[in-house]
Amino acid sequence: MGIAECRDKVLGGGELTKDEARGLMEADVTELAAAADEITRRFNGDGVDVEQLNNIKRDGCSEDCTFCGQSAFYDADKEPHPLPEPEEVVRAALKAKKEEASSYCLVAAWREPTPEGFEKVCTIIQEINTHVGISVECSLGFLTRERAARLKGLGVKRYNHNLETARSKFPEICSTHTYEDRLDTLEIAREAGLELCTGGIIGMGESRGQRIELAMELARIRPEEATVNILVPVQGTPMELQAPLPPGEAERFFALVRFLLPRSVVKISGGREKALDDDGRAILRGGANGIITSGYLTMGGNDSSADMEMIREAGLEA
């Protein structure tokens, strides 16, 4: 089945098979992106979900994810940053709202929150709700059912917990927890009524087949948001010498994710400024309808004004 037939199947409410997904990844990337854009417009309109992050607990993570510069395994001398005071986070959230962000995500580099850390995060969320009025999302590691219910009760809209890569690739990426651990937290979040944000990182040496495998897993989960990062190798990690993806491969993957998740937010996340010549402008017309702006967890990014201008120049709306 070709691009047009797959597009029409999706527009008609159908779901693609793995063989059809495999065929799309072999198709002409320009035609594929154009068809993905048609699907995006049909189901999602011209709006772009603009998100800002706050890395409220940085470095010293106990997990050994080979791509991550925040892991204690690869820089044991790096001291973990303490959680900021709520007032500091409120100021940053107010700035994000002024810069037209539609959501604000609190991110913490740990396996799971300590009891004291979780309570402080809850206080931060309450203060943002009181003083800012922006949609709050969280990425805090593994969840218990009790904590998921608490976050839902505080008005948290969406919970991020990435799969990172395909199940078949995951043992090469991390040994301190399993793929099933990640799936379990997504299930706990969903059971609590939280929307799901999940995705991964492409360009970590996985095969094209493994990228398809990841995309099919995302299609099975059906998150409200799928977030796709492109690896930026971090010095001192096992991935520091990883070669970049071939040209067009990121564009293919974003388009495929749109075919598989026609109604979800598909977000261009970390790595776009370094891995893509146009900062992701073409992908906003090739399947994506969301971006993270104003920097990421450990590296900078475009400021919000540049990204808002990019969105407008693409004929879209923040």
From Swiss-Prot:
Give residue ranges for domain Radical SAM core.
Answer: 46-272
The protein's annotated catalytic reaction(s) are: (4R,5S)-dethiobiotin + (sulfur carrier)-SH + 2 reduced [2Fe-2S]-[ferredoxin] + 2 S-adenosyl-L-methionine = (sulfur carrier)-H + biotin + 2 5'-deoxyadenosine + 2 L-methionine + 2 oxidized [2Fe-2S]-[ferredoxin]
Question: What are its E.C. numbers?
Answer: 2.8.1.6
Give the matching SUPFAM superfamilies: Radical SAM enzymes (SSF102114)
Xref: Gene3D superfamilies = Aldolase class I
Sites binding [4Fe-4S] cluster sit at: 61, 65, 68
- Protein name as annotated: Biotin synthase
**Any one Gene Ontology biological process term?**
biotin biosynthetic process
MF (Gene Ontology):
2 iron, 2 sulfur cluster binding; 4 iron, 4 sulfur cluster binding; biotin synthase activity; iron ion binding
As for family, the record states: Belongs to the radical SAM superfamily. Biotin synthase family.
What the protein does comes down to:
Catalyzes the conversion of dethiobiotin (DTB) to biotin by the insertion of a sulfur atom into dethiobiotin via a radical-based mechanism.
The pathway this protein participates in, as annotated, is: Cofactor biosynthesis; biotin biosynthesis; biotin from 7,8-diaminononanoate: step 2/2
* Cofactor binding, per record: Binds 1 [4Fe-4S] cluster. The cluster is coordinated with 3 cysteines and an exchangeable S-adenosyl-L-methionine.
Q: Which cofactor is recorded for it?
A: [4Fe-4S] cluster; [2Fe-2S] cluster
Subunit = Homodimer.
Species name for this entry? Answer: Cenarchaeum symbiosum (strain A)
